[in-house]
Amino acid sequence: MEEFQRYLEPDRFRQHDFLYPLLFREYIYALAHDHGFNSYMLLENIGYDNKSSLLIVKRLITRMYQHNYLMISANDSNQNQFFGYNKNLHSQIISEGFAVIVEIPFSLRLISSFEGAEIVISYKLRSIHSIFPFLEDKLPHLNYTTDVRIPYPIHLEILIQTLRSRVKDASYLHLLRFFLHQYSNWNILIITTKSISIFSKSNPRFFLFLYNSHICQYESIFLFLGNQSSHLRIISSGVLFERLYLHKKIEHFAEVFANDFPVIPCFLKDPFMHYVRYQGKSILASKDTPLLMNKWKYYLVNLWQCHFYVWSHPGRIHINQLSKHSLDFWGYFSSVQLNPSVVRSQMLENSFLINNAPKKLDIIVPIIPLIGSLAKARFCNALGHPISKLTRADLSDFEILNRFLRICRNLSHYYSGSSKKKSMYRIKYILRLSCVKTLARKHKSTARAFLKKVGSEFVQEFFTEEEEFLSLIFPRTSFTLRRLYRGRVWYLDIIFINGLANHE
């Protein structure tokens, strides 16, 4: 952000919220590829290699204006020849510029809102694992969850209208309309299952910004309703720096939505309602009765259709009882289980037994979906039998071993919060034997002969990685390490879901 402020201070257009001229500043595209900036935005750095030259950008924008999009039919939308042979490369260049520039006013506004406010900015809240301690604390006391699939697709104009309320540069928005045409005809919806996958992979940063801007409208309603119904006003939410920049937003939402919601229905006034969004879905957990949860369900459908003009269907919202249903959440299976215990109590000469059955959130590794991910990645077959990785047979022995160990270590790291860690032994076994078969195939040998040659140390390296990592953090006592390894450990440095754990 300091880079942005240094570049933008001498620019006169900053005073008038003009973003369009920034598209012709080459340092914008250099910043998009910078190591530090991309690490902050959680995207993989691909290096700045002068492909984003100012001349290329000017030519692309000129051709966008000269192209007649009214002549494109629905059948020709997939054969858009505007970008020619290097369509993916050039569209990525433009989308990176769009994404970097449109984030500037939001980031500057956010930083200015924190000035003078004594707020601790916690970057640890970026971790995926930071949500699980919250769920462990809250879900056992609730009864029902509403699994909501956020409605798709959405028309292009709705995205533009969402940005128009916050971005004042008409030229920038006009060019953005032209750019979005290459992904979908203006007369159809923007996102189908196939097109959203292509768009998000080729333009991840731009897609995330458009997606979050769109979803933020829904979450604004939840924030407003929650603030109105809760006795404890949401005034300390500014610590969620990377999530929604909620601080100093509450008063604005109260003014905006007060006219739309002059009377809050009684069934919405629930101080025990909790909301979590992930991977195009969201969870509403509550202590309400099934009748009130059904009212919530149809209220959400009407809200989307009437207030946001997005088509939805009640079938996209499922109400489940926590005690009978498992949540497929961030690659984990989570369910609320009873943990019965019997305590003998004695008062004077009388003794009696007290049966206690507190609820506990049980978080386990989904073995079958995880094996399916390994099979899709060609580490094993559909039955879970390890196979050799052909694409890595041309690497050196050290590189092959190091890559398999890194995959195994990352999975162990990601699933460290599981209450049943022994289930990970099967996954480690598949990766270990796949590594052995890959090396044996490279050396034109059998897996048994190769294992006999390298010895048992090779086997143990896959299974002791997590324990060795914990020994670097805590005192090296066998009791402490054994207790930590068997218990749940949530790490605050996991900022994206593991590729093999993503079963979507």
Swiss-Prot record:
Keyword Transferase (UniProt): no
Pfam family, any one: Intron_maturas2
Compartments, record wording: Plastid, Chloroplast
GO molecular function, a single term: RNA binding
Cellular compartments per GO CC: chloroplast
GO annotation, biological process: mRNA processing; RNA splicing; tRNA processing
Keywords: Chloroplast, mRNA processing, Plastid, RNA-binding, tRNA processing
Ranges in coiled-coil conformation: none
Main location as per UniProt: plastid
Role, per record: Usually encoded in the trnK tRNA gene intron. Probably assists in splicing its own and other chloroplast group II introns.
The family this protein is said to belong to: Belongs to the intron maturase 2 family. MatK subfamily.
Protein known as: Maturase K
Native source species: Fagus hayatae (Formosan elm)
Record gene name: matK
